[in-house]
Amino acid sequence: MNKCFIIVLVSVLMLGGKKPFSQQLETALVLPNISIQESIVFIAGFDESDNTYYSNAKQYFQKQEMPIEEGLHTINEIIAYINNAGENQVRFKEIHVVSHSNAWLGMSMRIKENGERITVKSLEYAVKEYNIESICKEYTGNTKIIFHSCGLGENKALLTELKHVFKADQVSASPYFNVFGGKYAEHYLAKPYYGYYPTAESKGPAFLSQEFRENYPNVHIDWLTALTTRQESSFGEAYSFKFNIPVEWEFTFDNSNDMPKLADKEAIMDWVSESPEMAEVLFALQIPIEKFRWRSSVNGNTLIIKGKTTVLCVLAPILQSNGANEYQNVRVEDRSLYQIL
């Protein structure tokens, strides 16, 4: 049984006794001395390679003199922390959660240790199977939760599910990319533009920049310069980074003679497109099938299909609309910058 329900049950039983408490004592039971803390920040991940997103975010929030918790990298751990604080009569006005995220793989934060990444599907399943901590609504009913997760605000369904899990008064996330520790601003938002190519089969920056021009004809960005610039170098100018998305399936046949002969990439793509299971995955990703590098292999009676695409992400910092030479102020209350539910 959830602890918050136990507390309510005990209070009702005690107040239902034959000898009434004094009004002062009854008030003390119903209205405990609650401490309201302005905010807390959960750094829900750790830096890998040369990506310093988490350490930059930590430095930013330290300068804001906000309490920071590190080492809690799962939603279960964060909920347990909030529950424990609530049991000790501590509430938070704002909870900030810093976690990597992208439009295809969901949040990098896990549901539990060694568990699945946070997506709509994984959260719904965890709630259904009681594999996720339950939070007491009284602890977060008046709390605003802000997710600093790139592009999460585009995924209204996932943000809605997170609001349900945290039982929060309000949740917010930006559809744009969060950048901490920038050259010209310690925290700013940037609009992403995407392109794709089969991993290790790039046709070069000139060809790719032409694809960006065709896909975004009304966007005034020097695509060639952006694609060859890997970090923020000039004020307000676009730059880019890349990452890979792999897909893999295994199919076991009763008889190896029933296995299709996939001689080349075209044969693999034909077979993938005719499979409802694989076609559904690619449809959800919204990445063209020809943008994957396809490979097949056989292990006994098992056919293994692997695909991998490289995502090129061009980031354009969002500037003040009044023409000032400044990046747009990051205000969570600004609905033009944040999805607020």
What are the roles of these predicted feature ranges?
Residues 85-86, 136:
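A general structural signal for stabilizing positions within well-ordered secondary structure
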Residues 18-22:
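Sec/Tat signal peptide C-region and signal peptidase I cleavage site
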Residues 93-183:
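Catalytic cores of nucleophile-dependent amide-cleaving enzymes
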Residues 4-13:
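Sec-dependent N-terminal signal peptides
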Residues 23-81, 87:
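A domain-level signal for caspase-like cysteine endopeptidase catalytic cores
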Residues 144-326, 332-339:
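Active-site-proximal C-terminal subdomain of hydrolase catalytic domains
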Residues 88-92:
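Low-complexity, serine/threonine/proline/glycine-rich extracellular segments that form mucin-like
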